[in-house]
């Protein structure tokens, strides 16, 4: 069988009702949701299954909710005996990838991402930061735009390098507005403001990163059993000291997702399994290289289908 990477989604993929079937049908998944409730001392599971969508979207709720659901999907998928050669995640998804790789316990991870969400929320007063997706412009040209705007006194930088022609910028509200206009003047097809609560993956998140360091200091981070591709370096991380450092840097650094996928391709990965709600990452992978095989698993039905497909492929190999 060709090499497999497990990918884990980030914020934005959440929806009310995600993981509910797993909770009802898979004892290991139910234990995870119960453990999340206990660790966070709140009924996170009730919010996920039947809560208010706006409340679930709040950064400090969305992050533990997505992590819990992704790991619940993983628990069911693991029953198949299919194991990854690599794991990776998009922003918050990196924590799920580290749990999957044995570097972080679920309990430590769910607590940490709850605090991470709170710190990100507190870092910049509401309305002062912004993010926007810039379509149809390469990273080098867009970086010249953001550097120019920043030099003129309005901080803005590249935040998510998702796939060819799709880059998210982040910074002060004014910086993002000016960079969006300048990008369009310089050939970008579109600039789409994003509905987010803060300027994530920008220098403005440094106060949050300092607080996050204290939380990570208290975590029992281990060396990873499976290589994890870091958002910050787009390269392999396995050592616990490196993992901790990268998680802190990740808050104020760009997510180099396109480069991460290219790194996985270079390592021989041809099958990408997106584990958790939605199909956002599968779409991005296809935009990096449409010949790659992507499978998105999020509930008992899609998990069974994926297992069947992979086993048939293996039998035919």
Curated annotation (Swiss-Prot):
- List the keywords (alphabetical): Acyltransferase, Fatty acid biosynthesis, Fatty acid metabolism, Lipid biosynthesis, Lipid metabolism, Transferase
Pfam families of this UniProt entry? Answer: Acyl_transf_1
Query: InterPro entries, from UniProt?
Result: Ac_transferase_dom_sf (IPR001227), Acyl_transferase_dom (IPR014043), Acyl_Trfase/lysoPLipase (IPR016035), Mal-CoA-ACP_Trans/PKS_FabD (IPR050858), Malonyl_CoA-ACP_transAc (IPR024925), Malonyl_CoA-ACP_transAc_FabD (IPR004410), Malonyl_transacylase_ACP-bd (IPR016036)
A Gene Ontology biological process term:
fatty acid biosynthetic process
Stated EC number for the protein is 2.3.1.39
Gene Ontology terms for molecular function: [acyl-carrier-protein] S-malonyltransferase activity
Q: In which pathway does it act?
A: Lipid metabolism; fatty acid biosynthesis
What EC class is this?
transferase
Active site per the UniProt annotation? 91, 201
Gene Ontology cellular component terms for the protein in this record: cytosol
Q: Which residues form a coiled coil?
A: none
Reaction(s) catalysed by this chain, per the record, are: holo-[ACP] + malonyl-CoA = malonyl-[ACP] + CoA
Origin, by domain of life?
A: Bacteria
Protein family: Belongs to the FabD family.
PANTHER family given for it? MALONYL-COA-ACYL CARRIER PROTEIN TRANSACYLASE, MITOCHONDRIAL (PTHR42681:SF1)
Q: What is this protein called?
A: Malonyl CoA-acyl carrier protein transacylase
Q: Which organism is it from?
A: Bacillus subtilis (strain 168)
